[in-house]
């Protein structure tokens, strides 16, 4: 089946999915949970296009938003290279570019649906890369993620950005300020975008590191609010790893596929080194937070054990006090019982007429009291 026909079928299927509300189901769960980098649906951004000839900027196309116009410029100038920059494009606009430049329908679908894992795929002479940008978010413990897709072909590069990062205008200025790099062709665009993504990681990584150090101090200081923050930070770091770690694989695959261009390999190797350094720092933050989480759990366990020990000691003291009270109550009860019996003053009580009745009753009270005291003392109730 011709590629344009497959693209038409893809457009119809995506339209049906949007009507049924099932388009987002194909996105990975961990990415669907983080949509704060996305603007409201329907907020389509601008489309820009640049033409370069032998590493130097050329006059832009008359209508940068028309991929057919860009294609005609490339056909008219055999040495020209085009870079089309799309910001949250509509399905129709991306489909139009796909038809003009022969983009593979699977890559186009990924670019439309978005929420993809970082990767580098090759479809014939066209490559498709997914990169996840990251930067400091609104909160102290928050990282803001964006997504950019890069199509590269023999004489063109198309970037599709979902979110506000990376700053593609800064990438354009850098490329135009380095004619030797720009002369390497469309792959230079992929390298420059990836390098910008890696550079943008630095502030976010630094903020995560500061937050991790701060929460570590709070944990050892016994701050009860530290535990939820440790969990939040650890979640941010894990999401950061899922965005940054695959980028290293993307760059390494680019090194393997660009074996013939030594200059480009040099740039990709440098970017891969930076990506590896970022990955190591993020992994260090993750290990630190995991250790802090374990220490926090240990401290909480010790605190709970101490509370239980105090409760046990308190219960034991209460039990001892109850025993002492019960023992004294029993000791005092016997004399009280004897006194109560003989205090009833009935006429026919033989002991009342006995001369030794009074001293004997006192001795009986004292003897029972002493006996009970000795018994409770032996049983350690006193």
Which residues make up each language-model segment?
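Alpha-helical transmembrane segments
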Residues: 194, 201, 278, 368-375
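Membrane-associated alpha-helical segments
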Residues: 155, 197, 205, 214-342
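A generic structural signal for residues located within well-ordered alpha-helices
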Residues: 79, 89-92, 185, 189, ...
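Divalent-cation
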Residues: 2-180, 184
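Alpha-helical transmembrane anchor segments
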Residues: 331-382
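Well-ordered alpha/beta subsegment
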Residues: 184-212
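Short, charge-rich amphipathic alpha-helices with coiled-coil/heptad character
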Residues: 180-187, 217-221
């Amino acid at each position: 089946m011709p590629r344009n026909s497959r693209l038409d079928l893809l457009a119809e299927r995506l339209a049906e999915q949007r009507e049924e509300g099932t388009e987002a189901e194909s996105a990975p769960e961990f990415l669907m949970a983080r949509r704060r980098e996305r603007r409201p649906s329907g907020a389509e951004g601008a489309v820009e296009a640049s033409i370069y000839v032998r590493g130097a900027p050329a006059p832009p196309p008359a209508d940068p938003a028309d991929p057919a116009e860009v294609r005609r410029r490339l056909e008219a100038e055999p040495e020209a290279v085009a870079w089309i920059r799309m910001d949250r494009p509509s399905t129709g606009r991306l489909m139009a570019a796909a038809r003009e430049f022969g983009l593979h329908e699977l890559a186009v679908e990924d670019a439309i649906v978005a929420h993809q894992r970082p990767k580098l795929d090759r479809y014939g002479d066209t490559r498709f890369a997914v990169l996840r940008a990251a930067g400091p978010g609104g909160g102290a413990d928050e990282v803001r993620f964006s997504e950019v897709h890069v199509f590269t072909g023999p004489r063109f590069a198309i970037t599709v950005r979902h979110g506000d990062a990376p700053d593609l205008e800064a990438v354009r200025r850098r490329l135009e300020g380095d004619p030797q790099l720009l002369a390497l062709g469309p792959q230079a665009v992929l390298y420059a975008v990836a390098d910008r993504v890696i550079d943008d990681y630095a502030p976010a990584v630094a903020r995560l590191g500061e937050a991790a150090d701060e929460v570590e101090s709070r944990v050892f200081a016994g701050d009860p609010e530290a535990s939820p923050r440790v969990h939040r930070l650890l979640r941010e770091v894990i999401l950061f790893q899922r965005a940054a770690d695959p980028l290293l694989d993307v760059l390494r695959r680019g090194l393997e596929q660009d074996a013939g261009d030594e200059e480009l390999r040099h740039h990709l190797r440098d970017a891969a080194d930076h990506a590896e350094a970022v990955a190591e720092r993020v992994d260090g933050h993750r290990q630190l937070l995991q250790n802090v989480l374990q220490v926090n759990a240990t401290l909480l366990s010790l605190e709970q054990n101490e509370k239980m020990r105090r409760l046990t000691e308190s219960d034991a003291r209460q039990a001892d006090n109850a025993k002492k009270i019960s023992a004294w109550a029993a000791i005092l009860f016997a004399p009280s019982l004897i006194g109560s019996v003989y205090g009833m003053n009935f006429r026919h009580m033989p002991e009342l007429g006995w001369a030794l009745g009074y001293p004997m009753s006192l001795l009986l009270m004292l003897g029972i009291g002493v006996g009970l005291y000795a018994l409770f003392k032996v049983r350690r109730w006193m």
